[in-house]
């Protein structure tokens, strides 16, 4: 009874928050008159995912004037998950959106618990055209539910002008190891006072990037067994992170906004992140021509390491019991799985790295980008994506990472990595069994 009461109370709270004037949610609409007559989409990031959905709405309505109106709502990633899970658990289907974006780290948890609530798209989407690691992420129990969107391919983006002040050239930034990256970073900081990158103690994407570049994750390939204590790639990632801190190569930030403002304001010399960060880098047009992109550094002394990885990335999912599931499936598959002209538009306007194996079908594939000194950024990132190791993210990435963050902070004070990883292993095993 108590659980039921709590669930009802939570539902009321969420529904009230969704309509409250002070909500964090920002709604933009393509000529929406009635919510009930609109295809409703929830996504995050106005410069990337939500912008892509709005552009898709514009293109689709031009081709299909009689199609339903399309409403795009910007919410935070966590907010989308919590709201949708609560609505599904309570079967309040009339409040559901038709389409949601889910980050690749989260999707297995969602599909394990709510598989029957999503539209399987095997007969609508040609999944063979997507890179293997992205295709596998949208599968569950032999069916495919998502339309892969951005790759999340990791890359090293750097300010050539800042590095040149320290005596380094574009050639010096090719085929880096992590030790060489840190050597360059030390000299850059000594000569310019600019740290090499941002580090956020409350978020560990860099650890994920390094770990996956070695073909490992927080869980084994079965997606369930916690793989912490004997995970050499994780240990190496944490050692690299620690060394970056000890050598003062990282600027401490807290959260997304500080991360973005640091490189937009020229406070760091490089960014190691996913290709989706391109749209944020290019927001500051005064820096056009100053940026370059290259492969991530290679982890030394690990025979499985490659200079390629992934961070984040997402796909579109259609809710089966929403008001307009069928027409939403028509819209999403046409725009995001079939229309190569529209994908060209996204490459040009938001800098997406599509999840396609073969980008030569896109006219914009070899386009050069003056912002990056004439580099063919899409082609480069696609070449990186082709060798990203495939790992099983499982369904507990963020839960295990929360444990790791807490214990790693203690390790930085106590200096005992073995003890740290042992504690994380024990706690992660408990989480993995839930």
Give, region by region, the residue ranges found by the protein language model.
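Extracytoplasmic/periplasmic solute-binding protein
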Residues: 145-149, 154, 179-226, 233, ...
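Extracytoplasmic "Venus flytrap"/periplasmic binding protein-like
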Residues: 65-132, 165-167, 269-270
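Short, low-complexity disordered leader/linker segments with a strong preference
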Residues: 1-40, 62, 426-434
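A structural signal for short loop-to-beta-strand junctions that line the ligand-binding cleft
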Residues: 86-89, 95-98, 122-163, 184, ...
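Extracytoplasmic/periplasmic substrate-recognition and gating elements
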Residues: 62, 66-71, 89, 166, ...
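Glycine-centered hinge/linker elements that transmit conformational signals in sensory
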Residues: 182-187, 223-253, 296
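Mature extracytoplasmic/periplasmic domains
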Residues: 33, 52, 116, 277-279, ...
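Hinge/lid segment of periplasmic solute-binding proteins
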Residues: 101-155, 180-184, 209-214, 292-296, ...
């Amino acid at each position: 009874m108590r659980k039921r009461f709590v669930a009802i109370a939570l539902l009321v709270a969420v529904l009230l928050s969704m309509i409250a004037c002070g909500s964090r949610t920002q709604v933009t609409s393509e000529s929406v008159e009635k919510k009930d007559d609109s295809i409703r989409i929830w996504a995050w990031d106005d410069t990337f995912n939500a912008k892509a959905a709005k552009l898709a709405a514009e293109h689709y309505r031009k081709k299909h004037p009689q199609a339903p109106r399309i409403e795009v709502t910007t919410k935070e990633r966590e907010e989308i998950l919590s709201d949708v899970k609560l609505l599904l658990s309570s079967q309040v289907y009339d409040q559901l959106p038709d389409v949601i974006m889910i980050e690749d780290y989260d999707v297995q948890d969602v599909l394990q618990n709510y598989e029957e609530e999503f539209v399987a798209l095997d007969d609508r989407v040609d999944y063979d055209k997507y890179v293997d690691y992205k295709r596998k992420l949208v599968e569950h129990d032999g069916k495919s539910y998502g339309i892969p969107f951005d790759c999340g391919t990791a890359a090293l983006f750097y300010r050539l002008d800042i590095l040149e002040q320290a005596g380094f050239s574009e050639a010096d930034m090719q085929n880096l190891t992590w030790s060489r990256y840190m050597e360059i970073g030390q000299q850059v900081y000594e000569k310019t006072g600019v740290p090499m990158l941002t580090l956020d103690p409350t978020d560990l994407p860099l650890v994920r990037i390094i770990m996956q570049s070695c073909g490992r994750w927080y869980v084994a390939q079965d997606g369930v067994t916690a793989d912490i204590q004997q995970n050499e790639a994780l240990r190496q990632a944490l050692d690299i992170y620690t060394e970056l801190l000890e050598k003062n190569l990282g600027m401490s930030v807290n959260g997304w906004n500080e991360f973005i403002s640091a490189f937009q304001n020229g406070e760091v010399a490089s960014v190691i992140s996913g290709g989706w960060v391109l749209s944020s880098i290019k927001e500051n047009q005064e820096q056009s021509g100053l940026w370059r992109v290259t492969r991530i550094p290679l982890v030394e002394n690990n025979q499985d390491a490659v200079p390629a990885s992934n961070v984040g990335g997402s796909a579109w999912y259609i809710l089966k019991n929403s008001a307009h599931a069928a027409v939403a499936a028509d819209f999403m598959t046409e725009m995001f799985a079939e229309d190569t002209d529209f994908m060209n538009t996204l490459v040009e306007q938001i800098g997406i790295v599509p999840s396609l194996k073969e980008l030569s079908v896109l006219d914009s594939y070899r386009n050069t980008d003056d912002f990056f000194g004439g580099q063919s950024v899409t082609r480069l990132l696609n070449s990186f994506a082709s060798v990203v190791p495939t790992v099983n993210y499982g369904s507990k990435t963020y839960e295990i990472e929360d444990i790791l963050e807490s214990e790693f902070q203690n390790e930085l004070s106590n200096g005992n990595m073995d003890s740290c990883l042992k504690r994380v292993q024990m706690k992660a095993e408990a989480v993995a069994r839930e």
